[in-house]
């Protein structure tokens, strides 16, 4: 064992008294009685001296700052005044030397120079004043931030309160600095270097201040017993008791300390918000979905405890969503009651404690799904042997997400009044787990592909059903008989449009895709999803309708009633789809999306968004399909009519004498014309029973126009025959033609204007014909309206007058 070393004598440690100044010796003699007293009180004296030196240094720094500020202000003012007075003296002296005629121009020029110089001086003065004020505030901030951190951390609530007071002063100083910088940014854009310099110094202080405030806040939460247990073991009547909230158990100094810590976090967030707004003055504004930082600090420890359960339930997402909903609901009222007054004290505008809590919980869940769940589903979807299982899991998860968002929306809306459902502002992205797809466009695209393929597959199964395209003729007949004439055209349901059953299936699947798109909280991803799914699915439906119509054998050689009924199926379905698309497009949700799409043209050509509504291009294509199909049916009718009575309606037809069916006193309709009109009447009856009223109205009106052209052209195509019986025959056949449309309108002659005017010409007396010839020779074409003729061309009227 080594012998103990003796400490050195004091003579080797203390300085030689002979070398010390007199003031130092006097100070030591005044504070220490003897050597033993020196050993006992030396450390205390050293601490006091260091403290006094620190205070003196602080005072010296403030004195230097004040002295610099006053000196610069005085020097700047005096120099500016001296220079201005000297310039004014020189200008007045030079003004006396100028001739009288040039005094005015010189005076104006010099006054302009004086104004510019004064503005420059004023601008410099503002710069110096602003710089000195910022220097003073930044120095004060640095003192508040760095001075308390250099000391020993307090372990009591009093030490924490002192530290919070210093931090609060620092945040207040930062807000004052930010207010000045905001004014400089708006009105003095050339002072960029000053702003950057101040930002750099403030950021250094903030990099120390923010972690310290957050660390103290987390430590205080941990001391309160946060987070609590996620469930209790006490069960009564089959229900688990609600989870106790430690925030509501705080009293006295603890409650006040937490309140101050909460306000510090809110102050930091407010400062950060103002700073971001200042930096984005000249940039494109983006929607910030940051929640309340203080609420996020409550959720983070809860999330770490919940993740254990989440990992166990990765393949049973309904349990995950149920747990999050339960915890959110159990703590929401307590959080709202305790934190909302603090938010009001922090003067956070439009901030709800309940919504901030719900948003933080939802964002926590979204983060877990983003990191742990969806990557696995994407991998399963890419693997061929697991693709079907991946799609099934994907659908199940998305359904759970949509249901969860609706439950959360309903929960938040219990005591708040939000805008209409589906609006882009009704359910913020922060309170929607579906917002995950807004952040991940590639996942949104994958989801759209899965939904579209599934909808198309199910639609192909629907059209294979034997009754898919069946029209209930008996039901529509009874409906036609019971409805009034005006009510026939007030259509709303599938039965009103006489559409087949498959039309409802098409619409239901389309709306399901749209409804999934509307569950997205952001409007642009919503548009992208609906365009990628519902819109493309509509084009698939149009193709199915087109193929179904092409299956009908529309031929004028063997046109049957069954063929016409089969053709009515896709026509009615198209009209029903058109009505629903127009109804959806008038909804405010689609009006908003169309306006947003028109402004940014999301994945659409410019001309596509100019149709007047969200489904404008689809409606345009659907109307073209309906028009083409109706024209095809009309063309078949006209061809069949021409085949049956092609030798009639000529004014020189030789077969009229043989085809006349006589009665006791009057002429009757020709056999060929009667057969053609009977065919036409039967076909119209079939269409009237099986086609929707709107398309049937368009069909018979256009058919009447075609027959009107056909008959009038036939009348003027041959050589004139001056036999009264021929005229009577044409009149009888034409009148029979008009009666075919009698069941569908009151005045069928209004839809055959050319035939009606031919009959008028044939019924003219010789004197009236002579007047018409004379008027044509004198006035030309302008006189026809005086004789009630406006649809026949002047050339045809002249031909008639020359021939008869």
From Swiss-Prot:
Q: What induces it?
A: By salt and osmotic stresses.
What if the gene is knocked out?
No visible phenotype under normal growth conditions.
Per the record, a Pfam family? Answer: RINT1_TIP1
Membrane among the record's keywords? yes
Q: What is the protein's major site of localization?
A: endoplasmic reticulum
| Domain of life where this protein originates | Eukaryota
InterPro entries from the UniProt entry: RINT1_Tip20 (IPR007528)
Q: Which UniProt keywords apply?
A: Endoplasmic reticulum, ER-Golgi transport, Membrane, Protein transport, Transport
> What tissue specificity is annotated for this entry?
Highly expressed in dry seeds. Expressed at low levels in roots, rosette and cauline leaves, stems and flowers.
> Which subcellular locations apply to this protein?
Endoplasmic reticulum membrane
One GO term of the biological process aspect: endoplasmic reticulum to Golgi vesicle-mediated transport
One Gene Ontology CC term in the entry: endoplasmic reticulum
Q: Which PANTHER family match?
A: RAD50-INTERACTING PROTEIN 1 (PTHR13520:SF0), RAD50-INTERACTING PROTEIN 1 RINT-1 (PTHR13520)
Role noted for this protein: May function in the anterograde transport of protein from the endoplasmic reticulum (ER) to the Golgi complex and in the retrograde transport from the Golgi complex to the ER.
Family assignment? Belongs to the RINT1 family.
Query: What is the name attached to this protein's record?
Result: RINT1-like protein MAG2L
Please name the source species: Arabidopsis thaliana (Mouse-ear cress)
């Amino acid at each position: 064992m080594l012998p103990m070393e003796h400490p050195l004598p004091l003579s080797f440690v203390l300085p030689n008294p002979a070398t010390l100044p007199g003031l130092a010796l006097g100070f030591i003699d005044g504070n220490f009685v003897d050597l033993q007293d020196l050993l006992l009180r030396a450390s205390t004296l050293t601490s006091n001296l260091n403290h006094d030196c620190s205070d003196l240094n602080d005072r010296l720094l403030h004195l230097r700052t004040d002295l610099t500020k006053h000196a610069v202000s005085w020097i700047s003012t005096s120099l500016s005044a001296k220079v201005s007075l000297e310039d004014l003296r020189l200008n007045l002296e030079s003004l006396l030397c100028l001739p009288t005629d040039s005094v005015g121009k010189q005076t104006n020029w010099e006054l302009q120079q004086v104004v510019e110089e004064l503005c420059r001086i004023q601008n410099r003065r503002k710069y110096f004043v602003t710089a000195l004020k910022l220097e003073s505030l930044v120095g004060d901030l640095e003192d508040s931030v760095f001075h308390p951190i250099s000391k020993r951390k307090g372990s009591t609530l009093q030490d924490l309160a002192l530290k919070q007071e210093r931090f609060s002063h620092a945040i207040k100083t930062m807000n004052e600095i930010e207010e000045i910088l905001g004014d400089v940014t708006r009105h003095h854009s050339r002072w960029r270097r000053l702003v950057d310099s101040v930002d750099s110094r403030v950021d250094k202080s903030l990099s120390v201040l923010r972690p310290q405030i957050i660390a103290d806040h987390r430590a205080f939460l941990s001391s309160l017993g946060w987070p609590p247990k996620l469930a209790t073991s006490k069960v009564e009547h089959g229900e688990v008791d609600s989870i106790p909230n430690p925030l509501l158990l705080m009293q006295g100094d603890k409650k006040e300390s937490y309140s101050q810590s909460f306000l510090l976090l809110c102050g930091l967030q407010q400062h950060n918000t103002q700073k971001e707004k200042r930096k984005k003055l000249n940039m494109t504004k983006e929607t910030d979905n940051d929640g309340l930082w203080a609420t996020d600090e409550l959720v983070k420890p809860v999330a770490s405890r919940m993740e254990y359960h989440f990992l166990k339930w990765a393949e049973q997402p309904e349990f995950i969503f149920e747990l999050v909903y339960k915890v959110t609901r159990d703590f929401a009222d307590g959080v709202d009651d305790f934190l909302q007054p603090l938010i009001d004290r922090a003067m956070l505008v439009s901030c709800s404690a309940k919504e901030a809590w719900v948003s933080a919980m939802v964002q926590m869940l979204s983060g877990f799904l983003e990191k742990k769940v969806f990557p696995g589903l994407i991998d399963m979807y890419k693997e061929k042997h697991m693709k079907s299982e991946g799609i099934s899991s994907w659908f199940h998860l998305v359904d759970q997400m949509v249901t969860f968002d609706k439950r959360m929306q309903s929960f938040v809306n219990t005591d708040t009044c939000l805008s209409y459902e589906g609006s882009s502002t009704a359910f913020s992205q922060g309170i929607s787990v579906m917002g995950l797809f807004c952040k991940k466009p590639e996942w949104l695209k994958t989801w759209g592909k899965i939904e579209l393929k599934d909808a198309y597959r199910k639609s192909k199964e629907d059209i294979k059903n034997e009754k898919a395209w069946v029209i209930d003729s008996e039901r529509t007949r009874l409906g036609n008989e019971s409805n009034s004439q005006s009510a026939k055209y007030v259509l709303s349901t599938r039965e009103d449009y006489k559409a087949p059953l498959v039309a409802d299936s098409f619409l239901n699947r389309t709306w399901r895709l749209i409804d999934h798109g509307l569950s997205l909280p952001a409007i642009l991803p919503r548009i992208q999803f609906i365009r990628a799914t519902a819109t493309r699915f509509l084009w698939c439906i149009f193709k199915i309708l087109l193929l179904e119509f092409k299956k009908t054998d529309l031929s004028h050689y063997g046109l049957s009633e069954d063929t016409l009924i089969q053709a009515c199926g896709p026509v009615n379905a198209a009209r029903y789809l058109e009505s629903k698309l127009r109804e959806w497009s008038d909804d405010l949700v689609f009006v908003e999306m169309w306006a947003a799409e028109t402004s940014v043209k999301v994945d659409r050509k410019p001309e596509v968004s100019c149709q007047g509504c969200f489904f404008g291009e689809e409606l345009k294509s659907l109307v073209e399909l309906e028009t083409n199909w109706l024209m095809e049916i009309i063309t078949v009718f006209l061809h069949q009519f021409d085949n049956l009575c092609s030798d009639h309606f000529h004014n020189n037809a030789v077969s009229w004498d043989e085809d006349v069916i006589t009665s006791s006193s009057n002429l009757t309709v020709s056999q060929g014309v009667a057969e053609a009109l009977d065919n036409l009447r039967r076909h119209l009856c079939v269409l009237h029973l099986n086609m929707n009223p709107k398309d049937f109205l368009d069909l018979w009106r256009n058919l009447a126009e075609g027959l009107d052209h056909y008959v009038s052209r036939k009348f003027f195509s041959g050589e004139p025959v001056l036999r009264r019986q021929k005229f009577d025959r044409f009149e009888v056949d034409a009148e029979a033609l008009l009666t075919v449309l009698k069941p569908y309108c009151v005045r069928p002659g209004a839809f055959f204007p050319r035939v009606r005017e031919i009959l008028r010409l044939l019924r003219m007396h010789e004197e009236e014909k002579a007047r018409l010839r004379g008027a044509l020779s004198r006035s030309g074409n302008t006189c026809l309206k005086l004789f009630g003729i406006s649809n026949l061309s002047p050339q045809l009227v002249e031909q008639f007058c020359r021939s008869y």
